[in-house]
Each structure stands twice: as structure tokens, then as C-alpha cells.
């Protein structure tokens, strides 16, 4: 069941218009596969798929447009679009004795989770006097000191907690501005997202370098005895050592981004001599995509919360410039 409330309005002889939508709803009988079910072992039967999941959602969308012109023939416009959406799991058959912070219910779909950490282990004393790590493979001076969240004296999966947001943004923003005067036109589009958490990785290029190539921004901030003891990233380790489980929340990164998505400058000719040649208009333009980016990531990424085998560092979003001529007959 989904509900929607909308308002549309215009002002100043339609030069300014806005549209606002607020929606909310609940979903019932969501399919859960057998692997997602949590059936106690004493039941003596394997779980079966069932339509028992429940979620709720709410959000809003706002769009504003402004168009105007001057007595000198300058036309200009601006468009702004904002959206916010948030969902929540109401029921997903969480085990009865699971700690509240590890249950799915009450959190968003796709909520990121992680160990927490308190910095780099800089001495043997610090390592041995801290909470014991259940899997000590790769645990060493120079690694990250994980936090014993539930206070039982052992670092294990019970210390994994919700962290940040899901890997999809709660807020998206889109701004477009433009102007035209005597055949010259200019437009610029800005795009941004907020409230999402992404997972970064220090290892680049799974093939053919086999995770041996590291990002320079990470290398410059690694903890190294005697040379970079002020570093905040754990020392480099071989991927197969198992040390990746001790990265804690360090690799959880604020996914906020702002970018100039595209821009275009154009000039259109409609002179009488063009018409004599059978040409209605002649347009010259230069445009660019992905011209500027602000991000907490050390890469240009718009999809996914983590990397896949087709590592995004191999094919990042690229800047692209285009020059063209458009002829209309």
C-alpha cells in the first residue's frame, strides 16, 4: 500500500513553478527465500521460502523551475530537483536472542555493518593488553585496534554493528542553469548525493597485478615504523593473509559526492545567406561530461557499495569533451 500527496503551484506569471510530492507506504508479504529464514534447529525441519517480510518507506520530491528574460533579449533559466527517500525493515524473522543492534528490523534495507576501530596498534603492549581477537590471523602491530563493542572481552562477529548508511543515497540533488542570447547558449548541470556509505579497498586491479598495486593516497598515509608512525591506515599486508577482516570501519567511507555532470556552450547561425544555401540553421557546440568531482573516495564511482571482479578502477568514469557541428536543412 502506497500513499502520495502532491502540490503544484506557479508564481509571477508562471516564471516560477514548483512541484512537491510526499509519499509513504508499507509493503507486506515480501518473499523470503529459505536461506533468509531463521528456523531454530530443534524444529527438526529445513526452512522453506515464505512471503512474510514487511517494510515501510517514506520520502519526498521537490522540483523548482524558473524561466525569465530581459529586455535585451537575454533568456535564462534554472531548475532544481531534490529528493529524499528512506525505507525500514519492519519484519525479517530475526532470531529471538539476536542483539537489537544486529537485527535487520528497525534498520534500512542494505544497511552497512562493520567492526569499529580506535586507530592503529602502535606497540606490542597495546596489542596484548587489548581485547582478544577471535581470528588472530594477520593481527599484528601496525594493524587496526578493533573495539569490543559488547564488552565480553573477545573481538568476534558479535561486535559487528550498523555503520553509517546503506550504499544508496538518501538524498539526491540535481541543479541545471542556462542562458541564451543572440544565438549563444550556455548550460551547466550539477549533481549530488548525500547520506550513503561506500566500501573502499586498498587493493587495486585484481588482474594482472594480483592486488599488488596500491593507491598512492593510501600509501602516503600508512602506518610504518620509524618513518610514518603518524599514519592512520594499517600497514600493507598480503591479501591472502586474512588481515582484511581487521580493517574495521576504516574502509567505510562517506559516499557524499558533488559533480559537474555536464556543460555545453553553443552558437547557432540562422543568417539569410544560409537559407539561400538550403540550410535552416548551423550550430557549433562544445560540451563536456564529468568535468569536476568532489568525493571522499579515491576514485570516481557512482555504483555499488563495494568493488567486484570487474574492478571499477580499471574503467572509472572519465572526463569527455565533444566538439560538433549540427546542420539542419
Region locations from a protein language model:
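Surface-exposed loop/turn segments flanking beta-strands in extracellular/periplasmic regions
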Residues: 37-47, 99-112, 116, 139, ...
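Membrane-embedded beta-strands that build the outer-membrane beta-barrel scaffold
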Residues: 3-11, 16-24, 60-68, 76-84, ...
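Conserved small-residue
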Residues: 50-56, 67-167, 289
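Outer-membrane beta-barrel signature, preferentially recognizing the C-terminal barrel domain
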Residues: 1-17, 45-71, 108-109, 166-172, ...
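Extracytoplasmic gating/loop element in the C-terminal half of outer-membrane beta-barrel translocons
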Residues: 193-283, 288
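Flexible, solvent-exposed coil segments and beta strand-coil junctions
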Residues: 34-46, 59, 150-158, 233-249, ...
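Outer-membrane beta-barrel and related beta-rich outer-membrane complex signature
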Residues: 28-35, 74-76, 87-103, 195-222, ...
Amino acid at each position: 500500500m502506497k500513499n502520495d500527496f502532491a502540490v503544484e503551484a506557479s508564481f509571477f506569471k508562471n516564471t516560477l513553478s514548483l512541484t512537491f510530492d510526499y509519499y509513504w507506504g508499507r509493503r507486506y508479504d515480501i518473499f523470503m527465500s529459505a536461506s533468509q529464514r531463521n528456523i531454530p534447529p530443534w524444529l527438526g525441519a529445513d526452512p522453506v521460502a515464505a512471503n512474510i517480510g514487511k517494510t515501510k518507506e517514506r520520502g519526498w520530491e521537490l522540483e523548482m523551475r524558473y524561466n525569465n528574460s530581459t529586455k535585451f533579449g537575454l533568456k535564462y533559466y534554472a531548475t532544481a530537483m531534490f529528493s529524499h527517500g528512506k525505507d525500514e525493515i519492519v519484519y525479517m524473522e530475526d532470531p529471538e536472542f539476536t542483539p537489537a543492534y544486529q537485527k535487520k528490523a528497525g534498520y534500512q534495507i542494505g544497511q552497512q555493518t562493520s567492526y569499529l576501530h580506535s586507530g592503529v596498534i602502535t606497540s606490542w603492549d597495546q596489542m596484548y593488553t587489548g581485547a582478544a581477537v577471535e581470528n588472530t590471523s594477520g593481527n599484528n602491530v601496525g594493524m587496526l585496534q578493533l573495539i569490543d563493542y559488547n564488552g565480553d572481552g573477545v573481538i568476534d562477529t558479535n561486535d559487528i554493528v550498523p555503520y553509517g548508511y546503506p550504499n544508496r543515497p538518501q538524498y539526491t540533488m540535481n541543479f541545471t542553469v542556462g542562458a541564451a542570447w543572440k544565438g549563444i547558449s550556455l548550460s551547466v548541470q550539477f549533481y549530488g548525493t548525500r547520506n550513503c556509505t561506500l566500501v573502499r579497498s586498498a587493493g587495486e586491479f585484481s588482474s594482472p597485478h594480483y592486488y599488488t598495486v596500491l593507491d598512492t593516497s593510501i600509501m602516503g598515509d600508512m602506518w610504518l615504523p620509524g618513518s610514518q608512525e603518524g599514519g592512520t591506515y594499517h600497514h600493507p599486508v598480503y591479501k591472502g593473509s586474512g588481515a582484511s577482516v581487521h580493517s574495521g570501519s576504516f574502509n567505510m567511507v562517506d559516499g557524499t559526492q558533488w559533480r559537474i555532470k555536464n556543460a555545453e556552450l553553443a552558437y547557432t547561425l540562422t543568417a539569410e545567406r544560409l537559407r539561400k544555401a538550403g540550410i535552416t540553421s548551423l550550430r557549433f557546440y562544445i560540451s563536456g561530461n564529468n568535468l569536476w568531482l568532489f568525493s571522499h573516495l579515491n576514485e570516481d564511482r557512482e555504483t555499488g557499495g563495494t568493488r567486484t571482479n570487474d574492478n571499477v578502477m580499471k574503467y572509472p568514469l572519465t572526463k569527455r569533451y565533444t566538439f560538433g557541428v549540427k546542420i539542419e536543412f
